[in-house]
Swiss-Prot record:
Residues noted as binding Mn(2+) in the record, renumbered to the chain: 14, 202, 204, 238
UniProtKB keywords: Amino-acid biosynthesis, Branched-chain amino acid biosynthesis, Cytoplasm, Leucine biosynthesis, Manganese, Metal-binding, Transferase
Top-rank lineage group of the source organism: Bacteria
Biological or metabolic pathway of the protein: Amino-acid biosynthesis; L-leucine biosynthesis; L-leucine from 3-methyl-2-oxobutanoate: step 1/4
Functional summary from the UniProt entry: Catalyzes the condensation of the acetyl group of acetyl-CoA with 3-methyl-2-oxobutanoate (2-ketoisovalerate) to form 3-carboxy-3-hydroxy-4-methylpentanoate (2-isopropylmalate).
Gene3D superfamilies: 1.10.238.260, 3.30.160.270, Aldolase class I
Protein species of origin: Shigella dysenteriae serotype 1 (strain Sd197)
Cofactor: Mn(2+)
SMART domains (UniProt xref): LeuA_dimer
Protein name as it appears in the record: 2-isopropylmalate synthase
Gene Ontology biological process: L-leucine biosynthetic process
Cross-referenced HAMAP family: LeuA_type1
Subunit structure: Homodimer.
Length: 523
């Protein structure tokens, strides 16, 4: 009988560590709700003790996610576990994930400890976590380089202490698939109480083997796989969840396991993560790359036309990719736009129909026909800009030629006041940015700029993603328009609003901290 493999998503914890700019609470929640819709069993959404912002993110997600178990990370440190529990207590169901290094190298050079001390600490911390929840996961950091006898001792002790999931990470992506399968098999042979816990794996892609190692572990008996959408993560990334999920589905004949994932949501979730995290998906990326279902060879094209199964082991539709693109025009009504969004799988709660329709009409007037990819881009940008705005682009104009310095004039609404400035720059985009900096006095430093076409042809929407540095912190901004300079200006204004909102959040956190301190003094 087929057994279920639990899908543990760590996009918002381990995956976020790869980003050049931290995600806002709203952006994290948007991804969390998409993961819930996709059907992940567990989502690890942060490391609450690391910062007040991470604590708030975990708490916000724990309060709103209902159908997936929410998890937070904690070192084998009392404060970590207590803070994780505090952030999660609003959830309907939650898990605490605690970890400690077990390899000789890490124990000697990082922890400056002994294996016996590590085991003692693991036991104590697992028991502490069990005081808050009956769902405790324990990870043996750098398990891939831990001798199997040592690893078995730690695992047995953690299970006896109350751990219900034991995670075996290949922390540095060093292990080969046959080795990793041997580790899992070895634990089943050596740990007498292993049937009392679920064995999980967490692999990294330093040698390009993360997915292979995870599947080898599943074949050897692991029943939870940890990873991130699109494989994002530190260094070369995490195990790519969509690849593992589809491999399990396509090769159920040999693996004899299944997941509870809604496969129809894979493509949309992948695209959302890519857009919010500002990490483009390579065209040749398995499952979700733009070329994953493309056939250019004449022989292949002929074979696909005769029978798709000749060269396709899965269909685009199986991951929710609808290849039929319908177009709307400025004569299409609000109901037609809503109907198309419904057909693409969007719920009304995921976008504001009034705002989307207004943006649709403006775009339709410019380019005539609006396609599915245009609607999705407009819905995404609309969601990103739903929060209160302190800054708003009122007007801009640019003068530029091949031989002269570009000049830009910009009007920016700053709260209730409209300010205007002009500036020169090395090209039209730089001139606009110089003018905006003069208006705000923020002195924002551009770190990364990227442009992506949303659609095809000369009238395609251009999405500009930027990362900017301000006071030692990095902020992400995104803008969308058929004009590249306008997209660029909107992206910078988005950055300014994110800076302003971050400052407002910091003020609110300080106010709450002061309020709590005053209450303590009163008591």
């Amino acid at each position: 009988m087929s057994q279920q493999v639990i899908i543990f998503d760590t996009t918002l914890r381990d995956g976020e560590q790869a980003l050049q700019a931290s995600l806002s609470v709203k952006e994290k929640l948007q991804i969390a709700l998409a993961l819930e819709r996709m059907g992940v069993d567990v989502m690890e959404v942060g490391f609450p003790v690391s910062s007040p912002g991470d604590f708030e993110s975990v708490q916000t997600i724990a309060r709103q996610v209902k159908n997936s178990r929410v998890c937070a990370l904690a070192r084998c440190v009392e404060k970590d576990i207590d803070v994780a529990a505090e952030s999660l207590k609003v959830a309907e169901a939650f898990r605490i994930h605690t970890f400690i290094a077990t390899s000789p190298m890490h124990i000697a050079t990082k922890l400056r400890s002994t294996l016996d001390e590590v085991i003692e600490r693991a036991i104590y911390m697992v028991k502490r976590a069990r005081n808050y929840t009956d769902d405790v996961e324990f990870s043996c950091e750098d398990a891939g380089r831990t001798p199997i006898a040592d690893l078995a001792r730690v695992v047995e002790a953690a299970i006896n202490a109350g751990a219900t999931t034991i995670n075996i990470p290949d922390t540095v992506g060093y292990t080969m698939p046959f080795e990793f399968a041997g580790i899992i098999s070895g634990l089943y042979e050596r740990v007498p109480n292993i049937d009392k816990a679920i064995i999980s794996v967490h692999t990294h892609d330093d040698l390009g083997l993360a997915v292979g190692n995870s599947l080898a572990a599943v074949h050897a008996g692991a029943r939870q796989v940890e990873g991130a959408m699109n494989g994002i993560g530190e260094r070369a990334g995490n195990c790519s969840l969509e690849e593992v999920i589809m491999a399990i589905k396509v090769r159920k004949d040999i693996l004899n396991v299944h997941t509870a994932i809604n496969h129809q949501e894979i493509w949309r979730t992948s695209q959302l993560v890519s857009q919010i995290c500002n990490m483009p998906i390579p065209a040749n990326k398995a499952i979700v790359g733009s070329g994953a279902f493309a056939h250019s060879s004449g022989i292949h094209q002929d074979g696909v036309l005769k029978n798709r199964e000749n060269y396709e082991i899965m269909t685009p539709e199986s991951i929710g990719l609808n290849q039929i693109q319908l177009n709307l025009t400025s004569r299409s009504g609000r109901a037609a736009v809503k109907h198309r969004m419904d057909e693409m799988g969007y719920k009304e709660s995921e976008y504001n129909l009034d705002n989307l329709y207004d943006a649709f009409l403006k775009l339709a007037d410019k380019k005539g026909q609006v396609f599915d990819y245009d609607l999705e881009a407009l819905a995404f940008i609309g969601k990103q800009q739903e929060e209160p705005e302190h800054f708003r682009l009122d007007y801009f104009s640019v003068q530029s030629s091949s031989n002269d310095i570009a000049t830009a004039a910009v009007k920016l609404a700053c709260g209730e006041e409209v300010k205007a400035e002009a500036a020169n720059g090395n090209g039209p985009v730089d001139a606009v940015y110089q003018a905006i900096n003069r208006i705000t006095d923020y002195n924002v430093e551009l770190v990364k700029y990227s442009l992506t076409a949303k659609g095809h042809g000369k009238d395609a929407l251009g999405q500009v993603d930027i990362v900017a540095n301000y006071n030692g912190r990095r902020f992400h901004g995104v803008g969308l328009a058929t004009d590249i300079v306008e997209s660029s200006a909107k992206a910078m204004v988005h950055v300014l609003n994110n800076i302003w909102r971050a400052a407002e959040v910091e003020k609110e956190l300080q106010r709450k901290a002061q309020h709590n301190e005053n209450n303590k003094e009163t008591v």
